[in-house]
Structure formats: C-alpha cells, structure tokens
Amino acid sequence: CFLLESFGIKIEGIGTTTLVIHGKKSIDLDVEHYNSEDPIESMFFISAGIVTKSKLSVLRCPIEFITLELEKLKRMGLIYSVTKEYLAKNKRTRLVDITISPSKLSAPLEKIHTQPFPGINNDNLPFFVPIACFATGQTLIHDWTWENRAIYFTELNRLGADIKLLDPHRALVTSVQKLRGAQIVSPPALRPTAIILIAMLAAEGTSMLRNVYSIKRGYADIAERLNSIGAKITVIR
C-alpha cells in the first residue's frame, strides 16, 4: 500500500480489513521505496529463541503486525521486553526491538487460531507449534485457512513431539520434556519447513533437514544468520 501511495494512488482503509483503491489511468514517475520489515521473520526468530530457552533480542520488529502474537505468548508465560517505537526507513512502519528471556510456558486455555488483521497472522500460526511442544499441558492449534497444512505439523513427531492431527485443520500438541535429533525431508510448504528447522534447533543431538529449497526461497541466508547467534548449522551442497 505504501508503494502504491508513493505512486499517487489513493487507498482508503489502510490498517483495517477492507481496502478501497482508487486507480489512475497511468503512472509515470520514479520513486524511492523501502519495504516494510517482515513480521513473519520476526516471529521465526522469536520462536527459535523460545524453544532453545535463549535470551535473544530481535531487532526491527513491525509491532503492529505481531501484537496479538506477543499477547498470546505473554499469557502463556513468556517473559519479554519491548523498546520504544521508532519508524522504519519508509517512515510509515512502526518498529520495536524485542528481547525474550528463558521462560516456563503453559498451554493456553483457548485454542490458537488466525483471524484477519489485526488478528494472529496466518503465516505466524505454525510457529506456535514448536513453542507448544514445550508449553506444559495441551495446546489446540486451529489452522482453518489452509487445506491440509496442519498435516505437516505432525512431522515434528519424528523429533519426539506429541502432536495428534484431529482433522485436516486442527492439531493437538501435548508438551514433552525434550526433542531428539532426526533426519527429515522438508515438506513442500515454507512455514512447516521453517518450524521443523526451529524444532531441530531445540532437539538434542544432530538433525538433518533435507531438500531445503522451500525454506531457502523464504529466508535469505538463514543458516548463516542462525549460526551468528549460536546455532551450529552446516549447509551441505
């Protein structure tokens, strides 16, 4: 939306669930544009920090798009702090730095599910699966928007998780004491592959994730970035 506005397009309803776009017959101008930071990438690193029981600071998080995720995690027992807001380079996106601390989590009483903005982001929902593996009790994850994506959540069982598929949209996650290393072939879907990688970071021993194209297309230099904060990942080419 911000890019279109820089082209002179009028957009009503930014920040709501409904947009009204008033088009133009032609656009002929040069603009300099900075993309907004990615809330899904923020949630990836938050999830990785939680399951590895790490103290981790995740910088430049677009707070508007992960507020409900943080509130859910707070209710589950996550200890974290948030800096004052500051603007991204595009002068529109509100950013914060989030520092998470090792926490004892409990399963929420209510199910975790997505909703249109400002609800939990559809692509952030899978990150609650590895988190729920270490949250005492049982967590119901309801992935109602994607057909059969929840099936891939059970791949974490290969690492020692206890996840039961109730139907193509709902998975029941029972907490476990630990995960163990395993070899897993990446699913064709990006987010399920990402949560397998996150779970492997928390698993004891060595794991191997094969056929990683799906995650490479969604996360730039992910192995190198994780290694920079303490992971031990070797990319085999």
Q: Where do the PLM segments sit?
A:
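Short, structured segments at the rim of ligand-binding sites
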Residues: 1-237
